[in-house]
Amino acid sequence: MRDFTYVDDIVEGILRVMTCAPAAASAPEGASAPHRVYNIGNSQPVKLLDFVRTLQQELIREELLPQDHDLAAHTELLPMQPGDVLATYADTSPLERDFGFRPATPLCEGLRRFARWYRAFYGPQS
Protein backbone atom coordinates (compact mmCIF):
# COMPACT_ATOMS: atom_id res chain seq x y z
CA MET A 1 0.00 0.00 0.00
CA ARG A 2 1.27 3.42 -0.95
CA ASP A 3 0.01 6.91 -0.16
CA PHE A 4 0.07 8.78 -3.49
CA THR A 5 -0.52 12.52 -3.52
CA TYR A 6 -1.25 14.82 -6.44
CA VAL A 7 1.53 17.36 -7.00
CA ASP A 8 -0.77 20.41 -6.75
CA ASP A 9 -1.80 19.25 -3.27
CA ILE A 10 1.86 18.97 -2.26
CA VAL A 11 2.60 22.47 -3.56
CA GLU A 12 -0.43 23.93 -1.76
CA GLY A 13 0.63 22.30 1.50
CA ILE A 14 4.19 23.62 1.19
CA LEU A 15 2.97 27.14 0.39
CA ARG A 16 0.68 27.17 3.40
CA VAL A 17 3.48 26.07 5.72
CA MET A 18 5.98 28.53 4.21
CA THR A 19 3.70 31.53 4.63
CA CYS A 20 3.46 30.87 8.37
CA ALA A 21 7.06 29.92 9.10
CA PRO A 22 8.51 31.19 12.40
CA ALA A 23 10.48 34.42 11.98
CA ALA A 24 13.65 33.25 13.72
CA ALA A 25 15.11 30.07 15.11
CA SER A 26 15.58 29.71 18.84
CA ALA A 27 18.95 28.95 20.35
CA PRO A 28 20.10 25.34 19.91
CA GLU A 29 19.87 24.84 23.67
CA GLY A 30 16.15 25.71 23.59
CA ALA A 31 13.67 23.06 24.68
CA SER A 32 11.60 23.18 21.52
CA ALA A 33 12.41 23.88 17.90
CA PRO A 34 10.50 26.73 16.22
CA HIS A 35 9.99 24.67 13.08
CA ARG A 36 7.78 21.64 12.70
CA VAL A 37 7.78 18.73 10.28
CA TYR A 38 4.47 18.19 8.47
CA ASN A 39 3.44 15.19 6.46
CA ILE A 40 1.72 16.13 3.23
CA GLY A 41 -0.14 13.19 1.78
CA ASN A 42 -3.50 12.02 0.59
CA SER A 43 -3.90 9.71 3.61
CA GLN A 44 -5.62 7.12 1.42
CA PRO A 45 -3.11 4.37 0.63
CA VAL A 46 -3.82 2.17 -2.39
CA LYS A 47 -2.27 -1.01 -3.70
CA LEU A 48 0.51 -0.34 -6.19
CA LEU A 49 -1.15 -2.47 -8.87
CA ASP A 50 -4.41 -0.52 -8.41
CA PHE A 51 -2.41 2.68 -8.97
CA VAL A 52 -0.84 1.22 -12.13
CA ARG A 53 -4.22 0.02 -13.46
CA THR A 54 -5.79 3.43 -12.85
CA LEU A 55 -2.87 5.13 -14.58
CA GLN A 56 -3.24 2.75 -17.51
CA GLN A 57 -6.96 3.61 -17.82
CA GLU A 58 -6.22 7.34 -17.86
CA LEU A 59 -3.41 6.94 -20.40
CA ILE A 60 -5.76 4.95 -22.64
CA ARG A 61 -8.46 7.63 -22.20
CA GLU A 62 -5.98 10.28 -23.38
CA GLU A 63 -4.88 8.03 -26.27
CA LEU A 64 -1.37 7.73 -24.90
CA LEU A 65 -1.73 3.95 -24.79
CA PRO A 66 -3.69 1.79 -27.24
CA GLN A 67 -7.17 0.60 -26.22
CA ASP A 68 -5.91 -3.00 -26.19
CA HIS A 69 -2.83 -2.29 -24.05
CA ASP A 70 -1.93 -5.51 -22.24
CA LEU A 71 -0.78 -4.50 -18.78
CA ALA A 72 0.09 -8.07 -17.77
CA ALA A 73 2.47 -8.38 -20.72
CA HIS A 74 4.32 -5.27 -19.53
CA THR A 75 4.38 -6.15 -15.83
CA GLU A 76 7.20 -7.87 -13.99
CA LEU A 77 6.49 -8.41 -10.31
CA LEU A 78 9.57 -8.57 -8.12
CA PRO A 79 10.03 -9.55 -4.48
CA MET A 80 10.39 -6.81 -1.89
CA GLN A 81 13.57 -4.87 -2.53
CA PRO A 82 16.01 -3.56 0.09
CA GLY A 83 14.48 -0.42 1.58
CA ASP A 84 10.92 -1.28 0.51
CA VAL A 85 8.21 -0.99 3.12
CA LEU A 86 4.90 -2.83 3.14
CA ALA A 87 2.83 0.33 3.45
CA THR A 88 3.18 4.11 3.57
CA TYR A 89 0.60 6.40 5.06
CA ALA A 90 0.79 10.13 5.75
CA ASP A 91 -0.79 11.35 8.97
CA THR A 92 -1.79 14.86 7.94
CA SER A 93 -3.74 15.75 11.08
CA PRO A 94 -1.08 18.26 12.29
CA LEU A 95 -1.14 19.98 8.88
CA GLU A 96 -4.92 20.17 8.98
CA ARG A 97 -4.93 21.37 12.59
CA ASP A 98 -2.28 24.08 12.11
CA PHE A 99 -3.10 25.26 8.59
CA GLY A 100 -6.64 24.09 7.86
CA PHE A 101 -5.38 22.14 4.86
CA ARG A 102 -5.81 18.53 3.90
CA PRO A 103 -4.84 17.23 0.43
CA ALA A 104 -8.06 16.16 -1.24
CA THR A 105 -7.43 15.27 -4.89
CA PRO A 106 -8.61 11.66 -5.37
CA LEU A 107 -6.14 9.28 -7.02
CA CYS A 108 -8.23 8.86 -10.18
CA GLU A 109 -8.61 12.63 -10.63
CA GLY A 110 -4.90 13.26 -10.03
CA LEU A 111 -3.90 10.61 -12.57
CA ARG A 112 -6.45 11.99 -15.05
CA ARG A 113 -4.93 15.48 -14.69
CA PHE A 114 -1.44 14.00 -15.06
CA ALA A 115 -2.39 12.15 -18.26
CA ARG A 116 -3.95 15.33 -19.72
CA TRP A 117 -0.86 17.34 -18.81
CA TYR A 118 1.43 14.69 -20.30
CA ARG A 119 -0.51 14.68 -23.57
CA ALA A 120 -0.53 18.49 -23.75
CA PHE A 121 3.20 18.73 -22.97
CA TYR A 122 4.56 15.82 -25.02
CA GLY A 123 1.80 15.49 -27.61
CA PRO A 124 -0.07 12.38 -28.69
CA GLN A 125 1.94 9.19 -29.01
CA SER A 126 2.22 7.48 -32.37
Task: Annotate each language-model stretch with its function.
Residues 1-126:
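C-terminal substrate-binding subdomain of Rossmann-fold SDR/epimerase-dehydratase oxidoreductases
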